Amino acid sequence: MYGRTSRRGGKRKMNNRKIKTELINDNFQNFKRYGIPKAQLVIADIPYNIGNNFYGSNPMWYKNGDSKNGESKLAGKAAFNSDFNFNIAEYFHFCNRLLKKEPKKAGARGRSSDAPCMIIFCAFEQIESVKNYAKKYGFKNSIPLVFIKNYSPQVLKANMRIVGATEYALVLYRDKLPKFRNGLKVDENGKNIKGTGHMIFNWFEWKRDNSKVYPKIHPAQKPVGLLKQLIEIFTDEGDIVIDPCAGSATTLRAAAELNRNSYGFEISRDFYNKAQEKMLNDINLQQTLI
């Protein structure tokens, strides 16, 4: 259906363990072909279903950001190739199959278990719909996340109304609270060490990446720094992270820098090639050298 597929990645050693980073040019629905292991965390930015209006309030709609110059090539364009045919039911079916099973035992009193979870970035208007679909596939629980920017892309509306400067996501999990790492340490008796561990609020600062380090590839690209924060909270080194809608592969880059195994799917050949060349190339070179 999607033509010839490609997969490229690399391995490197971390404490005598091999860490793998692999991006696959195929639809996530075909995951069985690739023998991918079960994930501790699935994290993805699903299409927002706003179609041709993605750049609607953004100056990028016009050449050089000025309406006097006429419309740019981005006018009337969607951010995602799948913005018109993304099947959220199939997405949750995939996630349910690829996440690890629930642990039999809950965590110690006052601590989380090692259960897996998924994080879905979505539009504010999609939150209730995403939660309802998630429940149908066994993800009964959710935690909302808010990301606060110090800028807004809606420049063209600045003198007309309040502009958007937030992004949203949901942490979805089945039954037990998912693995949670907040810096808490335990002693040899398994008791919490005072002074370790800290509260993690459900809002985060959205800090833009340094473009010289992390090039902009995809219009809806999420900052590597932010993704690293989330990955550190819900996984340990050596765990597996999967991004079914990888785009620019920033999730894979973030996971690799934190010594997590990662796999991603991207159906666009163009984004796949750019991600390999610009986002993952340094990682793959390091892995090859090691």
Task: Please name every model-derived segment.
Residues 1-272:
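Core catalytic lobe of class I
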Residues 125, 280-290:
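Class I S-adenosyl-L-methionine-dependent methyltransferase module
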Residues 275-276:
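Conserved SAM-binding loop
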